[in-house]
Each structure stands twice: as C-alpha cells, then as structure tokens.
Amino acid sequence: MVDMYASLRSNVGTLGQILGDTIRTDLDDTFLEKIEQIRHLAKSSRQGDDASREEMLTLLSSLSDDELVPFAKAFNQFLNLANIAEQFHTISRNCDELVCVPDPVEQLLGRMLGGKIDQEKVLACLKTLDIDLVLTAHPTEISRRTLIQKYSAVIDSLTALENTQLTEQEKKQHHLRLRQLIAQIWHTNEIRNERPTPVDEARWGLSTIEASLWQAIPDFLRQLNQQVEERTNTQLPIDIAPVRFSSWMGGDRDGNPFVTSTVTQEVLDRNRHTAARLYLKDVVLLVNELSMEGANEELLAYCNNSNEPYRDVLRDLRKKLRATIDYLNEKLEGHQPDVNPKDIIWHESDLKDPLMMLYKSLCDQGMSLIANGLLLDMLRRIACFGIHMLRLDVRQDAQRHADVIAELTRYLGMGDYAHWDESEKQSFLLRELSSKRPLIPANWQASAEVEEVVKTCRLVASQPARAMGSYVISMASQPSDVLAVLLLLKETGCPHPIRVVPLFETLDDLNNASNCMSALFAIDWYRGYTKGIQEVMIGYSDSAKDAGVMAAAWAQYTAQEKLVAISQEANIKLTLFHGRGGTIGRGGGPAHQAILSQPPGSVDGRIRVTEQGEMIRFKFGLPKLAVQSLALYTSAVMEATLLPPPEPKPEWRQCMQQLADESVVAYRAIVREEPDFVSYFRAATPEIELGKLPLGSRPAKRRVDGGIESLRAIPWIFAWSQNRLMLPAWLGAGEALKAASERGDLALLQEMEKHWPFFKTRISMLEMVYAKAEPNLSKFYETSLVPSELHHLGVQLRERLATGVEAVLELTQAESLMAHTPWNRESVELRNPYIDPLNFLQAELLARTRREEQSSQNVELALMLTIAGVAAGMRNTG
C-alpha cells in the first residue's frame, strides 16, 4: 500500500533534522540527546507505556532554569515547522488526492451545468456573488510577523526543491537556504516583548494582503474565468469581484480602550497608503510593458496623438500615486498637508477610468492578449481592494451609544434616556431622526468616554463610503440600539447611508433577533433609510460561552431561519454576517462545510464571515493557499445559493430542539451552577498567566473584577485548549446525545447525521474536538495544580468527556474518532509527541510560578514558550 503521507513525513523529517543540527551547533550534543530522549519517551508514553511517562516526567522536572527556555523553544519550533510542512503539503505536487481535493469550483460547475441548473442562472449567480471576508486581529495569532515571513520563505525553499529538474548544485543552494532560515528562526525571540498596539495589528493584516492576497486575487479570477470559459464559452466581467475584504483591525473598539478615533484615522490612512504603494508597483511594471503605439481614437485624443499613448497615461498615474503616497506620509507624520485635489488619487474612478481606457484601446487594436495580462490583473485588484485596500468596520458596545444619548438628554433637561422604556426610547429617537434641527448643542462639554464615541461617529461620517464597511453594534437586543447609532451618525453629519448592523450574541438575544428586526422593519422611517437592504450579525463566540456549542448552534440556525423569513416578507435583501472564531467552541471549522450547513435560503449569493487570528495565516498566508481558500468560499456560496440543503424534517427539528434544551442544562449545571467551577478553571488552566502573554491589544476581560461571564470568549477557549480538556467545545453536547440515544432516538440521530448537513457538521466538529482532547493530560494538570478538594470536579468533567466520545462513536458506528477523515487524524497524530512534553512542562512551570513569590525570568519565558508551542500544535488557539 502506498503511504499517502510519505512526502509530508519526509518534509517534517527534513525540517526536524535541520532544526536538530541547528540546536546542536548552538548548544551541544548532550542537550540535543536529551530533547530526543524526551521525544521518544513521549511517543512511548502515548502508546500506554507508564514507565516511559514516569521517566519523561522525571527528566522534565530535572531541567535546570538555564535549560528551560531552549527546551521549550525546541519543541515549539518543531511544531511550527510541522505546521509549515503540512501547509506546504496541501499545495505540493506530491499532495495525495484525499488531502488535496480537486478544484471545488471546477467540480461544482460540472455538477451544476451537467445537471438541471440553467447556464444563465449559474452565470448570473457567479457575477453577483458578494462574499466579504472580514479580517480580525483576535489575539490568537501567537506567531510574530518577523517569524511568519521566515516561515513563508521556508515554504518557498520546499517548493523549489520539488523541481525534479534541479542540478545538484541548485539542490545544495536550496538546502543551504533552508538551513539558514531555520537558524534565523531558532535565534529569533518568539515571544513579543510587548503587546501589539491596534495599529500593529492593522499592519499585520496589511502584510498578509501584500504577501499573499494581492497576488492571489488576480490568480484566482484568471483561474475562475478559464473554468467558466471552458464550460460556457463566456468571459467573466473585467470588474468581477466575488470576494472582497474588510477588517476590524483598528476599528473594533468593543472592550478595547486602546482603539480610539485617532487610531482608527491612522489605520484608514495606512490602508490607503498600502494600496497606493502596491498600485504604484503595478503601474511601474505597466510602463515597461505597454510600450506599443497603436491606439483607438479615444486614447489618441486623450494623449494628443502621442507616440507612446499608453505610457503617457501610465506616467500620469505614476505621478499621482507618488503624490498620494507623499500626502499620506505627511498625514501619518501628524502634519496637515496642503494639496491640490487634482494631483492625487481621491476616488476609485481616478485610477480605474484611465486604465479601462487603455484596456479598451488594446482590445480595439487586436491586442487582447496584452490587455488580459498585468493590466487586467490591476483592474481586478481595483475591483476587489479599491483605493482603500480594506473596508474598515467599526464595532462598539450598544451600551456606549445609550450612554451618549442619556448624557445628552440629561444635559438638555429632557429627562434621563437611561431610565426610559423601549417604547419611549424609540419615540424619542425617531422624532430626533426626523427633526431638521440638530440635537447636539455646539457648546456641549461631554464626558471623556462619551466624547470618544461622538468623535468616532464624526470620523465615520467624514470618510468616503468605500473606506468604511459596517457599523457593528455588539450586545444588541432592541430596536433602539440600532436607532441610537443612526441618530449619532445623523448628528455628526454623515452624508450617505451606512450599514448599521446589530450583533446578536447571547442565547436570549439570538432567540429574540427576529422580533427585534421585525419591529425595525415595521418603522417607515427605518425602511426608507435602509432602502430594502439589511445586514445582521450572528455571534458565535459569546453564544457558545453562554449556552454551550450544541444549544448555541441551534439558536444560530433558528435565528437565521426566522430572519430570512421576516426579511422576505418585508421584501428586504438580507445579508447575514457570521462572527465565527478559529475554534469549534467559537463557531470555527472548515468554512466550506459551515456555509453548506446554513439554513436553506440564508446565503442567497451573499455572506460576510470573520476570519480570525491565526486562521488568516493558515488560509491566506501563501498565494496558492489563498487561491484554494477563495475557490472554496466561492463554490460553497454558489452551492448554498443554487443547490441549497434540504429543509429539516419536523421530527429532526423536534429532536434538535430537545438536544439543545438538554445540552444547555448540562452545560450550565457546570459552568454556572457548580460553585467550585471558577476556582477549578483558574487553577487547572493557565488562564491567569495568559493575561501576561503579549498577544493582542485587547484586555482579556470586559470587566477587571468579573468572573466567567466577563471573560472574553478567546481566553476562555484558549485556556481550556492549553490543558487539553477543550471543555467549551463539547460540554453539554455529549450528554444530550447520550440521553437521546437512551430514549430510543439513535436511528433518528443517524438519519439526521446522514441527510442533514447542519447536524452532520455539528457531529464532525465534535469528533475533531474529542480527538484533540487528552483527559490524561488534563488530569496531570489537575494533580499538579488543583487543590485536592476540587478534584471531584475534574473527575466529573472527564466522565462527561468519555460519555460524549461514546455517544459520537455510537452515532457514527465508527471504530475510532475521525476514521472518515484520515488526513485530520494524521495531522493530530503527527504533532502529539511534540505537544505532550510541552504540556507536561507547562504544568510543572505553572506549579513552580504559583509556589514562588518571584519566578526567574527564564521560568516565565519558558512558560510563555510552552503556551505558544501548545497553541501551534493545536492549530486553533482561541
């Protein structure tokens, strides 16, 4: 039998060997031998050898302070290199067909056009696709940008080494480059010295676009055009943009006091600066390429019959782009530059129109081959990225807007908005929205917090429409939450409609979402404002933390169904914005699968989805990977639109509702009602220590003095993934499945898993989480860190985990977890011998730091490295 993963293992082995050689050179043979000994003991321990486990623990506890950091670093870097090898394997020539599926768009077009779907319908759907991927800087991207660039260079070398035509000398050069890169990685500090600022996070997002997506977008569209042309003999429009990008980096101020209006302005300027700089590079290349003389009448008239008409136009654009960059540099340095608006690029049309004129002229002169090269690529980049690169969303908590209006009504002697009921609030807001006089007096001195909200609205109001995305209201629950934002935007002079998007996050708010939107749709003023277009955001992270994954998933599904129904009834075009995380406990998982498991009718050619933290790098970090991801999104949205999943049968709904009800009871019985739970959580996980890790710019808690409910979803998930119990991603689900099976519903569950994509996805995600959970490791954390009087809770949690595993295996009738997804299983098994020692060392270091009043710098750094290493190994941190 051919080993499907031979090339993957070979690359992992090569990178691991080079890392070992690097460590030997830096330290010595003895230290490398100790690392190898621990790795082999970890493998034996995982196969059930208790003696090996004890020997490994003895070795780990005997590490000196000086050995801690290089040891943690070695295992951490091996896991990062394993991730690189796996990432490369999916784009490698040697990738097995079970890992690298055929192009999903190609397959889908074949199914659709070979089936019952009319060609015109397929083309119409494709041309109107509106997929908006929203990049967010959640603090799950552990790796520093410096290292990420080196990891990309490693993949470049692996790609080069796949070329079978290389000479021996060329092979040696590429191997030398690999050794140099891995040495650079080894000698670079992995842990940031300080937390990134919101501007740093935004720059990280821009670097992903520059390094990968800038090339991937035209590559993907060229591939898509070719596929469509081969099957339909039709060319896609020049300005087609099925996928666009937005960002929360520098715009998401929910619970982040460091994101101010000043920061948001700087990020907007940086976005525009990056776009201008990259377009300038394209134009410089085009000046060299478009040296031809033949032109149509329009272009010749524009250039006064110049001998180099194309170059004349491009030189003018080059001059304007350089002036635009100079202008933005001045702004970023804090100056107020004085410029002639005609000298710089202000609008998308300033860039697009001259290039379209060149494109048309080339085609008219029989030079379509040239027109469809770099010039077409640039036009398609403009259609995707505009001149602002990313549309920036603003997110703010609903309470902050209410505070502004309450302070204002008190100042004006109109009463206290905070004490009014919903009906009174709506009446007041609608009256002011319809009023021709301003509400905010010129001499009003607002408190600092209120002033910051007003400044943000003023900034949003001053921006061009294409620079901004949506204004998202977190913790929205009532129509007044939306109307309050609209009033503030009106008062700050916003000249154009902005998408104001309620985010429904908790279980109660999800269940009430359709009532809230129905009430808004019933308001004539509001319907006039929206012009029949509405966006609603569904929160995954907080609903799962509130109710557990099973109940949250069903609440999200039913909320979407109801929102679709009321929007159709009101003749409103609804876009659903999915606030998914990278992990299962925050709604993560394969995007293709997730989109196809949405309720029928809920996608309808358009969707917004957050792309979080490290998942941005895993999906879009390399141009080839990004092309794959773009194809997956495109095919999934087309399929969900034209071949929607079936409506769930009444008995499936009834069963799912019962599962949700029982799972939320089981989940909350532990998280809310178990008096020792918070104490156990804080002791058994590195939750407290995570606060010291300089990951993201946002504080880990909404309130410093709060408990679990105030903890953000990301550190909540991150902490449980560190001790390998993965609790938020399964608690409550297995208990509900077992209860359903015991009351005779097993056959019904199996029918649902086979025929209902929504339920199949839920079970698939549970399987993956159960496979990653390690009860023996979590027990070791408990023994090392948790007071003995709390151990009963750990026993109960591990029993619940075992119940869930049994329930899923009974449902799927499989002998082992992930039996049907061998690639995922291989991925987990490849990493375990390297993650396990880091986990054991982490528990040891946590015990040490908690015992000692002041830990050494080495102990603290080693602890941070174990946290980063486990995160790299688990591949989905928060």
From Swiss-Prot:
One Pfam family per UniProt: PEPcase
A cellular component term, taken from the record's GO annotations: cytosol
Enzyme class, broadest EC rank: lyase
Gene name linked to the record: ppc
EC number: 4.1.1.31
Reported cofactor(s): Mg(2+)
Catalyzed reactions per annotation: oxaloacetate + phosphate = phosphoenolpyruvate + hydrogencarbonate
InterPro entries membership: PEP_COase, PEP_COase_bac/pln-type, PEP_COase_Lys_AS, PEPCASE_His_AS, Pyrv/PenolPyrv_kinase-like_dom
Known function: Forms oxaloacetate, a four-carbon dicarboxylic acid source for the tricarboxylic acid cycle.
GO molecular function, one term: magnesium ion binding
Top-rank taxon, per record: Bacteria
Magnesium keyword on record: yes
GO BP of this protein: carbon fixation; oxaloacetate metabolic process; tricarboxylic acid cycle
Homology family: Belongs to the PEPCase type 1 family.
Keywords assigned by UniProt, alphabetized: Carbon dioxide fixation, Lyase, Magnesium
Record-linked HAMAP family: PEPcase_type1
Active site residues of this protein: 138, 545
Protein name: Phosphoenolpyruvate carboxylase
Source organism of this protein record: Shewanella pealeana (strain ATCC 700345 / ANG-SQ1)
